[in-house]
From Swiss-Prot:
Catalyzes the ATP-dependent phosphorylation of L-homoserine to L-homoserine phosphate. This is Homoserine kinase. NCBIfam families: PRK01212.1-4, thrB. Its main location: cytoplasm. It comes from Histophilus somni (strain 129Pt) (Haemophilus somnus). ATP binds at P96, I97, G98, S99, G100, L101, G102, S103, S104, A105, C106. The gene is thrB. Keywords: Amino-acid biosynthesis, ATP-binding, Cytoplasm, Kinase, Nucleotide-binding, Threonine biosynthesis, Transferase. Its EC number is 2.7.1.39.
Length: 314
């Protein structure tokens, strides 16, 4: 029996719409992500589900993304003339759906990594990542890797999608604390994409390029202040903030508390705030608990970058 954990991820990081993503893990050691267990059985295929958010999963197994991952993986095995083994997959759904924390990516990554290890790794990392992107595209309507790549590989990933590489890891600031606040409401990726304009002004395009280029440069040259300053979003946040509860007010409040940068995690409704030290992270977390959470399903975690990505649990 094998258990694979895939961590939460925050896509875009404000400055890199559909091109940047970071894997995160709580500093208290709790697992913020999904777990998929795989084991051999006598015949056929079985899919079971458990976990706090299991009630949010589709009632029909065929609509479960883990089932779709199994089907896609099996199709790729057949193309290599490899025998399909009888097995059972169990998804522990610990991530809220439509949270902006890469919930679907967690399930996809955990399932495909479990299957690849179960079959003695017939597929390379890039081949597996390509499958992950295809499955993610079925949910959001377009193939993008800014959740699955960091969830799978860890760290901060920049999507390059050229010269045989889907992504490359950016050097980052491990001393930063990431405060993630999920308000307990759901925003679908499709809904969050539909609210965006079909075109942007020349000035917005120039600003976006300047911010992203400067951010990547700052990461490579270890300029924390410049990197944090450039974490600005002219592509999505001005339009998506309407989907989030009192976002502008909360963003200003955590800035006043001393955070370096804040924004929408993925397509929302989770927001992130980056703190330079634990004291400011703790103050920000307390504020967000009291002012951003909307119900009992909401939560706040103080995290750091997860540089490992998907991994087996002992």
């Amino acid at each position: 029996m094998l258990r694979i954990y895939a961590p939460a991820s925050s896509a875009n990081i404000s400055v890199g719409f559909d091109t940047l993503g970071v894997a995160v893990s709580p500093i208290d050691g709790s697992l913020l992500g999904d777990v998929v267990q795989i084991e051999e059985i006598e015949q056929g295929f079985e899919l079971e589900s458990a976990g706090y958010f299991v009630r949010k999963l589709p009632k029909e197994p065929q609509k479960n993304i883990v089932y779709q991952a199994y089907v896609l993986f099996s199709e790729r095995l057949k193309l290599r003339n490899l025998k399909i083994k009888p097995l059972r997959l169990t998804l522990e759904k610990n991530m809220p759906i439509g949270s902006g924390l890469g919930s679907s990516a967690c399930s996809i990554v955990a399932a495909l990594v479990a299957l690849n290890q179960f079959y003695q790794q017939p597929f390379s990392k890039m081949e597996l990542l390509e499958m992950m992107g295809e499955l993610e595209g079925r949910i959001s309507g377009s193939i993008h890797y800014d959740n699955v790549a960091p969830c799978y590989l860890g760290g901060v990933q920049l999507m390059v999608q050229s010269l045989g590489n889907i992504c490359q890891q950016l050097p980052f600031f491990d001393n930063w604390y990431w405060v993630l606040a999920y308000p307990g409401i759901e925003v679908s990726t499709a809904e969050a994409r539909a609210i965006l304009p079909k075109s942007y002004t020349r000035q917005d395009v120039i600003s976006h390029g300047r911010h992203l280029g400067s951010f990547v440069h700052a990461c490579h040259t270890r300029q924390e202040a410049l990197a944090a300053y450039m974490m600005r979003d002219v592509i999505a946040e001005p339009y998506r903030e309407a989907l989030l509860p009192n976002f502008a007010e909360v963003k200003q409040a955590v800035k006043d508390l001393g955070v370096l940068a804040s924004g929408i995690s993925g397509s929302g409704p989770t927001m992130f705030a980056i703190a330079p030290d634990l004291a400011i992270a703790t103050k920000s977390a307390t504020y967000l608990e009291n002012n951003y959470l909307q119900n009992n399903e909401g939560f706040v975690h103080i995290c750091k970058v997860d540089n490992v990505g998907a991994r087996a649990l002992v």
